[in-house]
């Protein structure tokens, strides 16, 4: 029974994560978000292209995907089960590798934030504060996101979480950092665009 529930929640998480709200919101404005700006189907590109109001909407919708799956995960899956970690990762994988968009999508930050918020609101708050502080100092969204994810990840490892939850957090952190590799190189070359 545990296998069936874990499998079904993982599939549902991936399918839900694959709904790219950035594309949906931008399409209402007649824009293909994957062909403008960074071409990423995420909140940052929407903010740069359509403005803060639309960017905030996309962030909240993307975060809700992760939050909902995390709540279902906590309700149906034992935290010690390997399935807990798998379900945790599923909406982030769906968002980054959406089957609805040729297995391309966003970078997973908002969806991952939703997952963390669903598991530990306090940890999510700490991640947000780190993000806001770094962004305020340097005005780089990518640097703020990377720093927030790294700090959140190490806090997760030090926290009172199961091995499965920590494995899930490890996979999520790896995916997000991997998707930001080009940003890291641009930051090192001082070519990354600051957010005005």
Swiss-Prot record:
BP terms from Gene Ontology: phospholipid biosynthetic process
Reported function: Catalyzes the transfer of an acyl group from acyl-phosphate (acyl-PO(4)) to glycerol-3-phosphate (G3P) to form lysophosphatidic acid (LPA). This enzyme utilizes acyl-phosphate as fatty acyl donor, but not acyl-CoA or acyl-ACP.
Stretches that traverse the bilayer: 1-21, 53-73, 76-96, 115-135, 141-161
Alphabetically ordered keywords of this record: Cell inner membrane, Cell membrane, Lipid biosynthesis, Lipid metabolism, Membrane, Phospholipid biosynthesis, Phospholipid metabolism, Transferase, Transmembrane, Transmembrane helix
Main enzyme class: transferase
Species assigned in the record: Hydrogenobaculum sp. (strain Y04AAS1)
Family stated for the protein in its record: Belongs to the PlsY family.
Record's GO cellular component terms: plasma membrane
Protein name from the UniProt record: Glycerol-3-phosphate acyltransferase
Database matches in InterPro entries: G3P_acylTferase_PlsY
């Amino acid at each position: 029974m545990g296998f069936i529930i874990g499998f079904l929640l993982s599939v549902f998480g991936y399918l839900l994560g694959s709904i790219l709200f950035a594309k949906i919101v931008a399409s209402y404005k007649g824009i293909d978000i994957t062909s403008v700006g960074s071409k990423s189907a995420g909140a940052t590109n929407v903010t740069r292209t359509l403005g803060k109001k639309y960017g905030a909407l996309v962030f909240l919708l993307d975060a809700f995907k992760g939050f909902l799956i995390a709540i279902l995960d906590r309700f149906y899956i034992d935290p010690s089960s390997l399935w807990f970690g798998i379900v945790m990762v599923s909406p982030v994988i769906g968002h980054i590798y959406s089957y609805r968009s040729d297995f391309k999508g966003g970078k997973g930050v908002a969806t991952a934030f939703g997952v963390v918020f669903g598991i530990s609101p306090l940890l999510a708050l700490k991640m947000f504060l780190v993000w806001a502080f770094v962004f305020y100092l340097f005005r780089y969204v990518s640097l703020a996101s990377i720093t927030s994810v790294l700090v959140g990840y190490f806090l997760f490892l030090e926290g009172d979480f199961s091995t499965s939850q920590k494995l899930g957090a490890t996979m999520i952190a790896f995916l997000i950092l991997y998707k930001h590799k080009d940003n890291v190189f641009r930051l090192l070359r001082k070519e990354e665009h600051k957010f005005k």
